[in-house]
């Protein structure tokens, strides 16, 4: 389907506000996305009509809240190409999902000298948990390098995968370069060496069709807030048998079957990984976000991202005096464009754009090793979503021109 951006924008109340008297042009969607009124309405409806704790009551409100919570789990599984709902674990965010794998799967299994293969474009959320684990276990971290064109150096994959490799953890779509990595190829290579594969899908699940069974990974992590949902809700997906072989990550209520003074037994999966009271309202309302994206169609969401990214790359290149990072073609990347004007610091540019109502991100984007690879301290980053249109890209380009005028710099 063709996107009617103006119609979509009407579903997002925040897009009606002005920033410094200007229309809000929100281009920071890789950090978080705005929420449609369907989500906000469901959030209010939950508290107004069924607010109760789940899985631990037999009264009507508790049963209704539990049913809606578990319905959201089934919708997540369906959204991911028919994953098994028993393998869908709700966490606080993608970061916690990755830490869960590091501590509940990897830590008991890794020994000194075992290897974990990462890449040079990982978000800190898929670096720091493994740095901590390496300190705890004596495991060795290895890294698949990033080529100058923004793609991974897959020619090095077979050399870096060894008999000592226990896990490969790879970002699906870079939050800096936009690069979409061939995770199926990487997962298959890992499996041939007897290793498991974790896919950080925080920047892919919101923007393209993602089928957990088809990707071939053993674990998949993402966050709800990057796809029209709430903060405080993340997802870890795995096969139920993989989760069953793992001990819990956190202990407390909800994740137990029986507790005695000196011992305990665990609940079935996925609940043995959901200790304590979760963000019930957020999970319930997240189903509305998934319904909204399903109605739009993820193929259409992806096509819109490619079209808008291509337009942005063309317009920014025509502007001149900008360095653009990542693959040259829009088809190889998500809706993320990072760039620098070597005469204006990215933080200054972001500040001046904000005065024009334009929200971008400036900094290292929680990817400092990648910044070192690019030999820059930071970049400016524009990232798009379903409510962005070519007029937003035009506003960004004009905003950069205005920033150059502010500094009395020539601009084509």
Q: What does each of the following model-derived ranges do?
A:
Residues 1-412:
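Pyridoxal 5′-phosphate
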